[in-house]
C-alpha cells in the first residue's frame, strides 16, 4: 500500500512539474510575441515620424507644406505603391510562413512594419501631433487590457471569430464604398464599428496565440508562431489606433 501511495505521489509530482514547465514555456512564448509586436510598433512609429519630418515643412505663413520628397511620396502614383507594398508583403509572409526560417520571417515582419511606417507618415499631415500622441496612449491602454482579458479569461472566444472576420470584411467593403460617397456619417459609423471589431480581435487573437502554443515545438516552429502571433496583434493594435484616431483625433 505504501508503495502504491509513493507511486501516486511521484506521478502527481511529475504532472505538476510538467504543468509548471508548460506554464513557464507559455509565458516565455507570449513575452516573445509581445516583444516582437512592441518592437514592430516602435519601428513603424519611428519610420513614420522620420518620413513626416522629411516630407513636410512649415512655410512663412505657418502652414504645413510638402517638401519635394513629400510631393513624390504623397502627391503622385507612388502613394499607391506605399499602400500596396506592405499589403503584398503581409500576404506573402502569411502564405509562406511554413516554408520560411524563423529569422527570415522575423526580418520580413520588421520590413513590413517599416514600410507601413512610411505609409502612415500621412497621419501627421492630417492630425495634430498632440492628438496622435494622446490617441496612441489610449490605444495602448485599451490594447493591453483587452489582450490581458483574452489571455486570462476562461471563456472560449472561438465563436467570436467568425463574427469578427465578417465585421472586418464589412469594414473593408464600406470603406471602399465611402471612397466614392465621401460621407462623414458613414466614416463615423465605420470608425465606431472598427473600434469594436479590432477590440474583439485583440482578445480573440491573444487567446488563439495562447492555444496554439505547443511545448513540443522546435525552435523554428516556435519562432514562426511567435512572428505570426506578433503580426496578428500588431495589426490589431495599428488598426485600433487608426480607428480611434478617426473618431477622436484633432485634425489640422
Go through the PLM ranges and name each one.
Residues 1-252:
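A hydrophobic alpha-helical transmembrane-helix feature that marks the membrane cores
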